[in-house]
Amino acid sequence: MSEQDRSNTTKKSTVYVALFTAIAIIVGTVIVGIGGASNTQDASAPQAPAADLPTASITESNKAQITFTTNQGEIIIETLPALAPLTVNALAALAQKNYFDNTICHRLTTEGIFVLQCGDPTGTGTGGPGFNIPDENLPEPIENNYPAGTVAMANAGPGTSGSQFFLVYQDTTLGPDYTIWGTITSGLEIVQTIASAGVIEGGPDGAPATGVTIESTKVTIS
């Protein structure tokens, strides 16, 4: 093999490696960035025993609503304490302590997955309350298993739900990995209007172009 041939072979190998690396990066970005309502919040935080999780004393027979008053309007969530008691109690307890007040909804997805993600006090997608909630009420792996109006927990893997949650504004199919803990009974149109404005930099996944701040929260138990 001549020096020229060796040079050409080396160049081709370099191109193939670079191309493979680029493809891997692109695929990784798609999987991590758009592959679900995921985050990196508190992945290393301990999964708390049920007895140690915060509670709002909501029983399975109670009706409980969480009202998020945002700068875009009021969003009311009917919780599902019979199906996700640990999650409902933990989030209601956080809400009663004003944990969500003055926090932003930091993520909007607009292609394939249709959610607005909130609940991170840092607004970065990495924040959480310092504990993890066990998974509950996971849906079947079927089409549109997260229908419009669903409220579910974001996570960084099994058993890592903390305080971040997402509001589904259009029927969405996801892996059966996210605890469903409520339904939007009022304000879905607000989320849909926010979604219609898109992402701040024009992509399918990022901060919403219409800024959303949770100004206050109220828990109603009956």
Indicate where each model-derived feature is located.
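Cyclophilin-like peptidyl-prolyl cis-trans isomerases
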Residues: M1-S222
